[in-house]
Regions:
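Bacterial N-terminal signal peptides
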Residues: 11-22
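Non-catalytic substrate/cofactor recognition surfaces at enzyme active-site rims
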Residues: 28-546
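Bacterial N-terminal signal peptides that target proteins for export
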Residues: 1-12
Length: 546
């Protein structure tokens, strides 16, 4: 019996031939001739799955990994544009199945690449995270060493983030483990460069949803119940578009694709390492297009988005039973349908000599001001349902944490009980959030801005723009709508990507988790500055032609 996947691939092949015959290939206009360059493209990937137990990132208490559901990867795409009249330019984009990209991971990748391949401009490397909540933690938290010292707590530096030695691979060790492999993937992608072309397109898949529910009293809550009598509406917009960048070799054979989607990979949660729905998506796309295809995921602005279905939750669960597909499998199929549905037209629109420009800039953003009212107002939060001020939270949790820490010191046998670490790490996590908020109140008196790195890239008539935040969707929509480019990919949690949430004014007023002072370094004012400066940088890639 003929495999349905072989039939699908054969149909795609015929469609590609038909579309190639009927549609013109893209070409650079006369005004872009000087900036156009012959492309050389290279792909590589590396397995960054830890070889022993780690703390899993994401959430408000430590989780210790209990095995591997599926591997996590670094996927690298190297693009170099060589020009007849002028210098070449480049970018190496690397997607990581991690919750974020810490500054220390980014710098260690740069150091290793610089040493192994000095011809690579390491400032042109972009690392972005898929924001899976089932991957190793990278948090080293040197600032919390100060908190511990101030209060006479002797916590090993390697375990400052969680407040106690958890007896597994420390974050610092995993960072070195991952950096070595990520740097190797960067080098391999660079060495694999060959002449090729790109095409870009827009498709749609219903996947991510706004995760904030708003109520008639003006408040909103993350994952709040929608079946309450006072439920008013979902707080914000949802973006079901997919930005798709296809890469081709000189013979017009597909080599890989970049998928830009406004949804973090947060279906899975538990104690097993997983790439989340990107594992299912890779499998599905490779079944359709070939095992050799590379897939590079990017999260668009999605700080207030999630795969979780709130309004139609019961209907969605019923459909999973009827179809026999898990939510991750269903997402993988939807993304794959969207990516393959426009493939014939992408094959007919390959650009081998697009305009290519890459700028890296440091943008100064005003820090979110922590007011005295922020510190003294008594309120509950998503992770702390007690009604108390930030200072009261800190004082209470410090006493609780010190008591627990002392118990483990005096009775180490307590660490043999299953889940012994949950309560102490949850307490310490909330304690650290309160302490950092108090520290920021003092810091802002002398340091009012936060510098962030932004990449903007032009490839033909498309643009890519990065930021280090969990950027609320509205800002991404503003950038896409106002951009000079025909199509713009906004990439959050990138290079490095540890800026915290960047919420809208609407969300700040609602008071949900991602918009409170404890969760945010930058507020809505900084969000508008980021949008405007990003747009200026994108426009400069076109204005230089004038």
């Amino acid at each position: 019996m003929t495999s349905p996947f072989r039939i699908a691939r054969a149909w795609l092949g015929l469609s590609l031939l038909a579309a190639s015959a009927s549609l013109p290939a893209a070409a650079a206009g006369p005004e872009s001739e000087q900036a156009a360059g012959r492309l050389r493209l290279g792909w590589a990937s590396a397995d960054i799955t830890p070889d022993r137990s780690v703390v899993i990132a994401g959430g408000s208490a430590a989780r210790i990994s209990q095995g591997v559901s599926n591997q996590i990867y670094a996927t690298a795409l190297a693009i170099e544009a060589t020009r007849d009249n002028g210098p070449s330019d480049m970018v190496i984009m690397v997607s990581l199945d991690l919750v974020g990209v810490t500054g220390i991971l980014y710098s260690r990748v740069q150091e290793r690449v610089s040493k192994a391949a000095p011809e690579i401009d390491t400032d042109k490397i972009i690392l972005n995270a898929t924001h899976t909540h089932t991957a190793p933690d990278q948090g080293t938290a040197p600032d919390l060493v100060k908190m511990h010292a101030q209060h006479g707590i002797d916590v090993p530096v390697a375990w400052a983030k969680w407040g106690i030695d958890l007896g597994v691979m420390p974050a610092e060790e995993y960072i070195d483990f991952a950096a070595e492999r990520i740097a190797a993937a960067v080098g391999q992608a660079w060495k694999a460069r060959k002449p090729g072309g790109i095409s870009f397109g827009l498709s749609y898949a219903t996947t991510g949803r706004n995760r904030l529910t708003a109520y008639y009293n003006g408040t909103s809550d993350m994952y709040g119940a929608a079946n309450r009598p006072d439920f008013s509406h979902v707080e914000g917009y949802e973006d079901h578009s997919l930005g798709l960048l296809y890469t081709w070799d000189a013979e017009k054979k597909l080599t890989g694709l970049v998928i830009n989607i406004a949804m973090p990979s947060q279906v899975a949660y538990g104690s097993r390492i997983s790439a989340d729905f990107w594992h299912e998506t890779r499998n599905e796309l490779r079944r359709r297009l070939g095992e050799e295809i590379f897939i590079l995921p990017q999260v668009a602005a999605a700080g207030d988005q999630s795969p979780k279905v709130i309004v139609d939750e019961r209907a969605e669960q019923r459909m999973e039973k009827l179809t026999g597909r898990s939510q991750m499998q269903q997402i993988g199929i939807r993304i794959s349908d969207a990516a393959t549905s426009i493939l014939p037209f992408m094959n007919a629109s390959i650009d081998f000599r697009p305009v290519f420009k890459h700028r890296v800039d440091q943008v100064e953003l005003n820090r979110r001001v922590i007011t005295e009212k922020d510190l003294t107002t008594r309120r509950s939060t998503f992770h702390n349902r007690q009604v108390e001020s930030v200072q009261e939270t800190f004082d209470r949790l410090l006493a609780e944490y010190k008591k627990m820490y002392k118990q483990f010191e005096e009775h180490p046998e307590l660490k043999t009980k299953p889940g012994w670490f949950v309560s102490v790490t949850a307490t310490h996590w909330l304690l650290a959030r309160a302490w950092r908020t108090l520290e920021r109140y003092e810091l802002q008196k002398t340091v009012s801005t936060l510098p962030v790195k932004v990449h903007v890239i032009r490839i033909g008539e498309m643009a890519i723009a990065t930021n280090p935040f969990e950027l609320y969707l509205d800002y991404g929509i503003q950038i896409k709508a106002r951009s000079k480019a025909v199509q713009t990919f906004v990439v959050e949690l990138a290079s490095p990507g540890g800026g915290g949430y960047l919420p809208t004014q609407r969300s700040v007023e609602g008071g949900a988790y991602g918009a409170i002072p404890q969760s945010t370094l930058i507020g809505p004012e900084g969000g508008r500055v980021l949008v405007n400066r990003t747009l200026e940088l994108i426009e400069s890639l076109w204005d230089e032609e004038k």
